[in-house]
């Protein structure tokens, strides 16, 4: 039986299932903004507490540590949903060390009716739309009201959890295949270089006698 649909009222979302709801994010979640920590206390040595900067949301890695005073409200833990507020507005489910959240990054806090991982899958496309609608001659900046006004379409919590389980499984498989393909591409690129080098220095006939070129890397 085909599921009944209804208009979402949002042009880029289109129709949604009849039993789904749609609300602005400010009515079903909150945002914790990073702190403008004093860079005088930044270090590249792991003698302080890990600090998440905007570039780390893309990479998922930590390269900066903080040795000053801080409030625990700015702590980020594994499973938290983070958004970079400059550039491409990247989203990441944090899966690294517990860390502090620096300025120009934010943590998405969902209400009890929204699964955090569901939001992590949902937000990237919505933030892409925001990015496209944001005019700028330099780096684009995400504002507080931009996040609060994002329309969130969502089903009951148990269906959100089912959606997350499916996407976790499928995306893991896709990432694994992509990693294998990248390895194969690297091998093929190396073979291509070797083939070209071998052909332009040894010729087509591999049976002819060889002589020392006098150049170490040619042979």
Regions found by a protein language model. Give the residues of each.
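Non-catalytic DNA-recognition/assembly elements of restriction-modification systems
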Residues: 4-35, 149, 153-157, 161, ...
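A short beta-sheet element
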Residues: 53, 72-125, 134-136, 143
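Generic structural signal for secondary-structure transition and capping sites
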Residues: 33-37, 127-128, 193, 204
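Sequence-specific dsDNA recognition surfaces
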Residues: 23-41, 48-78
């Amino acid at each position: 039986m085909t599921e009944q649909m209804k208009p979402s009222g949002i042009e880029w979302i289109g129709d949604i299932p009849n039993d789904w709801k749609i609300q602005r994010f400010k009515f079903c979640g909150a945002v914790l903004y990073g702190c403008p920590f004093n860079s005088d206390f930044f270090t590249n040595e792991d003698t302080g507490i890990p600090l998440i900067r905007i570039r780390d949301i893309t990479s998922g890695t930590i390269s900066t540590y903080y040795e000053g005073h801080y409030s625990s409200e700015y702590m980020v833990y594994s499973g938290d949903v983070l958004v970079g507020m400059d550039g491409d507005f990247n989203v990441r489910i944090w899966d690294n060390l517990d860390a502090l959240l620096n300025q120009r990054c934010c943590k998405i806090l969902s209400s009890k009716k929204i699964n955090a991982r569901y939001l992590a899958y949902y937000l990237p496309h919505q933030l892409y739309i925001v990015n496209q609608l944001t005019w700028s001659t330099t780096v684009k900046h995400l504002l507080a009201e931009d996040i609060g006004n994002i329309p969130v379409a969502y089903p009951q919590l148990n269906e959100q959890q089912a959606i997350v389980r499916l996407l976790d499984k499928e995306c893991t498989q896709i990432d694994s295949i992509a990693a294998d393909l990248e390895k194969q591409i690297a091998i093929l690129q190396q073979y291509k270089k070797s083939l070209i080098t071998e052909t332009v220095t040894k010729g087509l006939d591999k049976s002819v006698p060889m002589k020392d070129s006098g150049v170490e890397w040619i042979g």
